[in-house]
Amino acid sequence: MMNTISFKIHVFSSLFFLALGSHAISHHDTKALIGKLTKRIDSGESTAENYYKRAIEYRVLGQIKEAENDLKMALERNVNFTAARREMTRILSKKGKYKLAILSAEKVIINALTKREKSSAMILLAEVLLNAGEPSEAIKYSSTAFKLNPNGKIEWYLLHARLLREIKQDDERPAILHTGYQTTGSIVLRNAWIDSLVECEQYETALPIIEKELLESRIKSSWRLRRAKVFIGTGKINAAMDDLRTCLKELDRRIYPKNPDMTLIADRGLVHALLGNIDTAKNDLAHLVQIGADEWITAPLEKAIDSIGNQ
C-alpha cells in the first residue's frame, strides 16, 4: 500500500515539475528566437517577414509595445503584408484605438484575394466593432462572413452568438450555436449551445442533455451548475441549492491557487453569486481581472453579480 502511495506521489511530483519546466523552457525558447531574429535584422536581413516573426514572439511574452513597433516596421517594408496587418489590428483594438483598428481591418478586407480571406477579414472587423461598442454594425460583418464561407469556424459561431446577445436577439442564439456544433463537431460549441438553451429558458430541451452528462461525466461541476440554473428557472430552489453546494466542493478541490484555471474560477464565482455570496463572487471576479481573463470568461459572472446584487 505504501509503495503504491509513494509511486503516485512520485508520478504527481514528476508531472508537476515537468509542467513547470515546460513553461520555463517555452519562455526560454521564445527569448532565444527573439535573439536570433534580432541578429538577422541587425546583420542586414531586415525583411518584413523577420520583423513580423519577432513581433509574434514579443506578443507571446506580453511585450506589446515591442510587438507593435516590429509590426510597423514590417508594414513599412510591405504595405500589403496581410498577416502583419491583422496582428496590428488586434493590438490597436486591445489598446482601445478603435478608429485606427477599424481602418486597419478595412485594409485587410480590401487586400483579401479570395472569399475565404475576405470572410476571415470580415470577422476581424466584427471583433473590432464589438470591442468598440458597436454590436449592431459588427453583426452585419459576421453575417456577411457566413454568406461568403457558410461552414465558418468555431470562433465565428461564438462571436455571432455573442453579438446576437448584445443586440437583444437572444432567442436566435441556440440555433446558430447548434448549427455550428453540427457543422464542426466542436465540444466547445455543443456546450455553448446547451448554455444558450438554459439562458433562453428552453429547459425541456436542455435538461435531458445535462442529466445524461451528469450520469456519464467524471468531472461534474459544470453540469451541476447548468442543472442548478435549470432548477432555479423552474422554481426548484432546494434542488438548485443542493447542486450548487456540491458543485462548490468540487470546484474548490480542482482550483490550484498557484496556477488556477480561469474558467473554474469563473464557475466558482457564479456558484457563489447564485448562493447569494456576492462579496465572495466579487473576489473571484477581481481575481480574474487581475490575472488577465478575457471578457468572454468574466462577462457571465459580472452579469450575475449585477443581476443578483440588485434584487
Model-derived features: where do they sit?
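N-terminal leader/linker segments that initiate helical-solenoid repeat arrays
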Residues: 18-65, 69, 310
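Canonical positions in the second alpha-helix
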Residues: 40, 73-74, 107-111, 145, ...
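Structural marker of alpha-solenoid helical repeat scaffolds
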Residues: 43, 77, 111-114, 148, ...
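Residue-level recognition of tetratricopeptide repeat
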Residues: 47, 81, 115-118, 152-153, ...
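Canonical tetratricopeptide repeat
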Residues: 53, 87, 120-124, 158-159, ...
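Register position in tetratricopeptide repeats
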Residues: 60, 94-95, 131-132, 166-167, ...
